[in-house]
Swiss-Prot record:
Record keywords: Cytoplasm, Methyltransferase, rRNA processing, S-adenosyl-L-methionine, Transferase
UniProt keyword Acyltransferase present: no
Protein name in the entry: Ribosomal RNA large subunit methyltransferase H
Cellular component aspect of the GO annotation: cytoplasm
Main location: cytoplasm
Length: 156
């Protein structure tokens, strides 16, 4: 089983890549965390936002494994505590399918992509910079894994 972060956009600041890579490196071999970047649709005047999101959705669909659990990151998604995310992680491991966490572009995700997801997750009620999602999600997944292993990284 793999954890995939499929994110629209590339050429993130060095701190974004360093943060993501640090927590991906800490994950165990049996639960690798991998980043797949998808090119953002150019924001040009006169092009409807819906068309740009649809183009990004097609690129996302093209890189998703055929059988994977889709979890979209969305500001209207469900809140999860670390303990709840750890329980979900254990359940996903029991099912054995890859899990793809899908991060949209500046305008979010196309409705069709949201509808195809098994779950929707909100990282925070705060408005955060788009680039912060990658290292924040990687840390949350690493922390959830440490909870499942009673590792001292997470403290209540």
């Amino acid at each position: 089983m793999k954890l995939l972060v499929v994110a629209v956009g590339h050429r993130m600041p060095a701190w974004v890549d360093a943060g993501f890579d640090e927590f991906a490196r800490r994950m165990p071999r049996e639960l690798p965390l991998q980043l797949i970047e998808v090119k953002a649709e150019p924001r040009t005047s006169g092009k409807p936002v819906e068309a740009m999101m649809a183009a990004e959705a097609a690129r996302i669909e093209a890189v998703l494994p055929p059988r994977c659990r889709r979890v979209v990151l969305d500001e209207r998604g469900g809140d999860r505590t670390t303990a709840a995310l750890a329980r979900r992680l254990e359940a996903w491991q029991g099912e054995g399918e890859d899990v793809a966490f899908i991060v949209g572009g500046p305008d979010g995700l196309a409705p069709s992509l949201k509808a195809s997801a098994a779950e929707s997750l909100r990282l925070s009620s705060l408005t955060l910079p788009h680039a912060l999602v990658r290292p924040l999600l990687a840390e949350a997944l690493y922390r959830a894994w440490t909870v499942t292993r009673n590792h001292p990284y997470h403290r209540e």
